[in-house]
């Protein structure tokens, strides 16, 4: 079986297992987005190129996006309190520099998968800035990516004909 087909099989199996596990955990209050965050991280792993470097880059930039989102929220709160702006307008204003930083950090190899930073920001905000569920969701999803890729490689090796047999 070629590598892409084998990886497709293992991705499907891993996605199904992730859905099973995360949907049960997601029944607990505050954990509703665990499945979504994990699936996005799963995609982020492959989009960052897969393998060891894809895992490292994806996870690092997902986490950096969370940190920038946290600082953006703190800055928006501060700006609203000192300026009299509404929280909405303070958030709009602080989105500009913190979004730019996510792009600018891309000059560094570890943070060069720029979309991953925006995924981290977005899902951290979507979770209500829940550090635990977002950190664990990104870690689990990237790990599921590694497992599915490795499984695909092993399945391909086990099912590929060798020496003409």
UniProtKB/Swiss-Prot annotation:
Record-annotated disulphide pairs: none
InterPro entries, per the entry: DUF1097
Membrane topology: Multi-pass membrane protein
Pfam families: DUF1097
GO cellular component, one term: plasma membrane
Transmembrane segment boundaries: 30-50, 65-85, 86-106, 108-128, 131-151
Alphabetical keyword list: Cell membrane, Membrane, Transmembrane, Transmembrane helix
Locations listed in the record: Cell membrane
Keyword Lipoprotein: no
Family label: To E.coli YcdZ.
Protein name, per record: Uncharacterized protein YahC
Origin organism lineage: Bacteria, Pseudomonadati, Pseudomonadota, Gammaproteobacteria, Enterobacterales
Name of encoding gene: yahC
């Amino acid at each position: 079986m070629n590598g892409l087909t084998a990886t497709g099989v293992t991705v499907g199996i891993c996605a199904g297992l992730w859905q099973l596990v995360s949907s049960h955990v997601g029944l607990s209050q505050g954990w509703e987005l665990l499945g979504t965050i994990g699936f996005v991280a799963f995609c982020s792993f492959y989009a960052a190129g897969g393998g060891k470097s894809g895992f490292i880059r994806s996870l690092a930039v997902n986490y950096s996006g969370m940190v920038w989102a946290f600082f953006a929220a703190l800055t928006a709160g501060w700006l609203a309190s000192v300026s009299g702006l509404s929280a909405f307008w303070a958030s709009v204003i602080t989105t500009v520099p913190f979004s730019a930083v996510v792009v600018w950090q891309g000059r560094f190899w570890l943070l060069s998968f720029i979309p991953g930073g925006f995924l981290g920001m977005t899902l951290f905000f979507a979770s209500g800035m829940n550090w635990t569920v977002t950190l664990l969701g990104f870690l689990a999803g990237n790990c599921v990516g590694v497992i599915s890729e490795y499984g695909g490689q092993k399945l391909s090796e086990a099912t590929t004909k060798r020496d003409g047999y």
